[in-house]
């Protein structure tokens, strides 16, 4: 789950995979939080972390400026709210794109909605640098809901299927949803972001 190596304009990329337990009526984890560094728990104890959350896992209000965040939800639920007044509850297959620009405060929490079963949560988050002239553009928030995102199916030589969800740019002639108005112009013409599902042993 540690950040991956990136190159400009990508500032940061991290993969979160947490096998959260059943939730309570307040969407907090069932059981004790003893042994965790509450407020900064990245322990992966029992297969999951609280991160900066104190009752509900996740990342309470914190600031960003001068770059963009792209959050790709693979499994579970994410609750977003920010200083622009935007809120969203999104999950499996949805993508959130936020341009921090001149500054925004937001939170990303992982509510444990299911009381009768576990609440596994998986997501990728990418930070995308803005060029100097766009560092202080107006903040912007948008959602790419799962049904609006192109998915390309790819078969290998043994007819095993991979799927490519096109989040930004293009893949195999299919385009991603329209990006925010002030996204990095250095990024989109030359690169793409895709979420790819590959079966174990498959070639892509």
Predicted regions and their residues:
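Jelly-roll (double-stranded beta-helix
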Residues: 1-204
């Amino acid at each position: 789950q540690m950040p991956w190596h990136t190159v400009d304009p990508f500032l940061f990329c991290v993969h979160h995979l947490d096998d959260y337990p059943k939730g309570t009526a307040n969407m907090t984890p069932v059981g004790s939080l003893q042994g965790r560094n509450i407020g900064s728990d990245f322990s992966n104890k029992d297969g999951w972390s609280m991160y900066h959350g104190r009752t509900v896992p996740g990342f309470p209000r914190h600031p960003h400026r001068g770059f963009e965040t792209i959050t790709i939800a693979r499994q579970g639920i994410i609750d977003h709210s920010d200083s622009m007044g935007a809120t969203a509850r999104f999950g499996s297959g949805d993508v959130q794109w936020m341009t921090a620009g001149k500054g925004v405060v937001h939170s990303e929490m992982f509510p444990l909605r299911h009381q009768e079963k576990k609440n596994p949560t998986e997501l990728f988050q990418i930070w995308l640098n803005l060029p100097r002239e766009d560092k202080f553009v107006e903040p912007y928030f948008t959602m790419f809901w799962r049904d609006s995102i192109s998915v390309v199916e790819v078969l290998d030589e043994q007819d095993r299927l991979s799927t490519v969800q096109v989040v930004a740019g293009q893949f195999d002639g299919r385009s991603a949803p329209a990006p925010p108005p002030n996204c990095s112009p250095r990024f989109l013409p030359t690169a793409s972001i895709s979420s790819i599902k590959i079966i174990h042993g498959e070639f892509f």
